[in-house]
Swiss-Prot record:
Interacts with tubulin. Interacts with USP9X. The modification Phosphotyrosine is found at residue 70. The modification Phosphothreonine is found at residues 289, 326, 336. One of its GO terms (cellular component) is neuronal cell body. Microtubule-associated protein required for initial steps of neuronal dispersion and cortex lamination during cerebral cortex development. May act by competing with the putative neuronal protein kinase DCLK1 in binding to a target protein. May in that way participate in a signaling pathway that is crucial for neuronal interaction before and during migration, possibly as part of a calcium ion-dependent signal transduction pathway. May participate along with PAFAH1B1/LIS-1 in a distinct overlapping signaling pathway that promotes neuronal migration. This is Neuronal migration protein doublecortin. Its main location: cytoplasm. One of its GO terms (molecular function) is protein kinase binding. Gene3D superfamilies: Doublecortin domain. Keywords: Cell projection, Cytoplasm, Developmental protein, Differentiation, Microtubule, Neurogenesis, Phosphoprotein, Repeat, Ubl conjugation. It comes from Rattus norvegicus.
C-alpha cells in the first residue's frame, strides 16, 4: 500500500517560497534603520573615545612657564594616574612641583579634575603637588591663538607677518651699524682691565652676540657679562646703544652692580688708554712713561743731527724738539725714518706727548 504525500510537498514548497520571498524582498533585522542608527552611534562614541584632546598644562605658581600641550586619549593613558605620572616626568622641578603632579585644577582654580573625561578640548589646566591652588595669570605669556579651534588661515598669516616684521627689523638694524671701536672696562676694584672691541656689520649681528664677544675679551671673574653701562650710568639694552655718542662702557657680571660715582670715573691710566693711539692701546697693556722714552732716545737722535741744531732744540722740559720734527730733519743713512726701528720709536714717543706734554708743545710753537 502506497501513501501519497503530494499535498505535503505542495505545502512545504509554498512555505519555502514564502521564506525565500521574505528574505529577498524584505530587509533583514540587521539591516534595519534602527540597527543602522545604533551602529552609527556606537562608531561615533568609539571615535570620540579614541580621539585625543589637546589641552595645555601649567605649573602651579610658575608665572614664567608658558605651559606644555598634551594630547590626552584613552589609548595613550589607560588611567588618570598614568596621566599624572607622565605629567610628573614632564613638569616636575625643584621649585614648584617638588612632589610631582598629584592634583589638576582648572585654569581659574574653581574645580579639581578627577578623571580624563573631565578634560575638555582646547582648555588649560594647572598641575599642583599639594591641595592648594596659587592664583596666577598663567595665560599672559602664551599666544592666544594656540588653540586647535582657530582657523588655519589665521595660523598661516601669523608666521608670514612675523617673518616680514623680522626681516624688516633686520634691515633696519643693519642701517645704523658702522665701523666703530669701543672700549670695555671691567667693573670692580681699580686698576681695572680695559679692552677694545671693533664693531661693524660682520661682528655686530645682534646684542647677545656682542655680549658673548665682550665676555670672551674681558674675562670677568664672575663669568658672563650680563649688563653694560655708559659712563653716565645708563644701561645698554640694545645693539643701537653701542653706536651712539658713547665709546666707553662698563661691563658687569651676574653680581648686583652698585651705582657708585667712583665706578664711572676713570683714573689716569684709564684715561691714557682712552686718549692714546688705538693701535698702541688695543690691549690692556699700559703705555710707556715719558721719562723712560726720553732717556732711551736722545743717544741715536743726537748722532743724526748737527751739534748746532741739537743745542737749539733742547729747550722745553728737557725734551728735544728733534723728536717731534724727525721726518723733516736730515738723518744719516744709518738710521732712516722709514726703518722699522725708527717707526717703533716714533710710535712710543708720540703717544705720551699727546697726553702729558700738550702744554710744552704749545709753548714751543
Amino acid at each position: 500500500m502506497e501513501l501519497d504525500f503530494g499535498h505535503f510537498d505542495e505545502r512545504d514548497k509554498a512555505s519555502r517560497n514564502m521564506r525565500g520571498s521574505r528574505m529577498n524582498g524584505l530587509p533583514s533585522p540587521t539591516h534595519s534603520a534602527h540597527c543602522s542608527f545604533y551602529r552609527t552611534r556606537t562608531l561615533q562614541a568609539l571615535s570620540n573615545e579614541k580621539k585625543a584632546k589637546k589641552v595645555r598644562f601649567y605649573r602651579n605658581g610658575d608665572r614664567y612657564f608658558k605651559g606644555i600641550v598634551y594630547a590626552v586619549s584613552s589609548d595613550r593613558f589607560r588611567s588618570f594616574d598614568a596621566l599624572l605620572a607622565d605629567l610628573t616626568r614632564s613638569l616636575s622641578d625643584n621649585i614648584n612641583l617638588l612632589q610631582g603632579v598629584r592634583y589638576i585644577y582648572t585654569i581659574d582654580g574653581s574645580r579639581k579634575i578627577g578623571s580624563m573625561d573631565e578634560l575638555e578640548e582646547g582648555e588649560s589646566y594647572v598641575c599642583s603637588s599639594d591641595n592648594f591652588f596659587k592664583k596666577v595669570e598663567y595665560t599672559k605669556n602664551v599666544n592666544p591663538n594656540w588653540s586647535v579651534n582657530v582657523k588655519t588661515s589665521a595660523n598661516m598669516k601669523a608666521p608670514q607677518s612675523l617673518a616680514s616684521s623680522n626681516s624688516a627689523q633686520a634691515r633696519e638694524n643693519k642701517d645704523f651699524v658702522r665701523p666703530k671701536l669701543v672700549t670695555i672696562i671691567r667693573s670692580g676694584v681699580k686698576p681695572r682691565k680695559a679692552v677694545r672691541v671693533l664693531l661693524n656689520k660682520k661682528t655686530a649681528h645682534s646684542f647677545e652676540q656682542v655680549l658673548t664677544d665682550i665676555t670672551e675679551a674681558i674675562k670677568l671673574e664672575t663669568g658672563v657679562v650680563k649688563k653694560l653701562y655708559t659712563l653716565d650710568g645708563k644701561q645698554v639694552t640694545c645693539l643701537h646703544d653701542f653706536f651712539g655718542d658713547d665709546d666707553v662702557f662698563i661691563a658687569c657680571g651676574p653680581e648686583k652692580f652698585r651705582y657708585a660715582q667712583d665706578d664711572f670715573s676713570l683714573d689716569e691710566n684709564e684715561c691714557r688708554v682712552m686718549k692714546g693711539n688705538p693701535s698702541a692701546t688695543a690691549g690692556p697693556k699700559a703705555s710707556p712713561t715719558p721719562q723712560k722714552t726720553s732717556a732711551k732716545s736722545p743717544g741715536p737722535m743726537r748722532r743724526s743731527k748737527s751739534p748746532a741744531d741739537s743745542g737749539n732744540d733742547q729747550d722745553a722740559n728737557g725734551t728735544s724738539s728733534s723728536q717731534l720734527s724727525t721726518p723733516k730733519s736730515k738723518q744719516s743713512p744709518i738710521s732712516t725714518p722709514t726703518s722699522p726701528g725708527s717707526l717703533r720709536k716714533h710710535k712710543d714717543l708720540y703717544l705720551p706727548l699727546s697726553l702729558d706734554d700738550s702744554d710744552s708743545l704749545g709753548d714751543s710753537m
